[in-house]
């Protein structure tokens, strides 16, 4: 088994990553940053997003696992205080995993060229200055002309992030779907949008045709300048992300811990 360790630059994360490397070497586990079987993310959910994007081309063959150096996150099952227990689970790994849906984003340029990207969390299209105007198509048909600050499209696991702040629903990751939410849409007697989040199944895609070239496309922690882009397509990817599952942490428990806390 080959392990890659991806950590943020916070002092505590660096210390934990060094301890983990020493533990792996002590147990004769190979450290391989190029072709790992398991990628260990040391940090928070943002760090795991960075790890996913680094190894996105190996999505089908690697498993991720998060070691959190703060509070328990949505993508991290282990706390840094549980390092010894985590190491024991890692060295006795037998391939156990759980998989979740990914978002496939296709960017079409004016030249006709298209580029595909994968997102674990979400993709956000925003207009830095002024109003974003874009035609939205669903099921191959024109649905609405959006006017506002932007659009967010999230995976089920990403539904607890920006999507939730936009008033979107929290989706269980067992559902193969994506969700579109509006960011500060303009609704009056002249301009109208649906004004509510949309949940789209895996056999359909969302198509967005912006009316300007001055917008930003962000997916996870990556960014694409919105120059010479004529179309953006969003759908559930045929690929899935795989996490090493050494213990079960219920999704709704994660949601409760993050937003509600314990019920008395």
Swiss-Prot record:
Binding site for NAD(+): 45-46, 121-122, 147, 149, 184, 221
Residues annotated as catalytic: 45 (proton acceptor)
Keyword Transferase included in the entry's annotation: yes
Subcellular location: Cytoplasm
GO MF terms, alphabetically ordered: ATP binding; metal ion binding; NAD binding; NAD+ kinase activity
EC number: 2.7.1.23
InterPro entries: ATP-NAD_kinase_N, ATP-NAD_kinase_PpnK-typ_C, NAD/diacylglycerol_kinase_sf, NADK
Classification via Pfam families: NAD_kinase (PF01513), NAD_kinase_C (PF20143)
Keywords: ATP-binding, Cytoplasm, Kinase, NAD, NADP, Nucleotide-binding, Transferase
Keyword NADP: yes
Disulfide bonds: none
GO cellular-component term (any): cytoplasm
Gene3D superfamilies per record: Probable inorganic polyphosphate/atp-NAD kinase, domain 1, Probable inorganic polyphosphate/atp-NAD kinase, domain 2
Main location: cytoplasm
GO biological process: NAD metabolic process; NADP biosynthetic process
Superkingdom field: Bacteria
Cofactor: a divalent metal cation
Catalytic activity: NAD(+) + ATP = ADP + NADP(+) + H(+)
Primary role: Involved in the regulation of the intracellular balance of NAD and NADP, and is a key enzyme in the biosynthesis of NADP. Catalyzes specifically the phosphorylation on 2'-hydroxyl of the adenosine moiety of NAD to yield NADP.
NCBIfam families: PRK04885.1 (NF003424)
Assigned protein family: Belongs to the NAD kinase family.
Protein name (record): NAD kinase
Organism: Leuconostoc mesenteroides subsp. mesenteroides (strain ATCC 8293 / DSM 20343 / BCRC 11652 / CCM 1803 / JCM 6124 / NCDO 523 / NBRC 100496 / NCIMB 8023 / NCTC 12954 / NRRL B-1118 / 37Y)
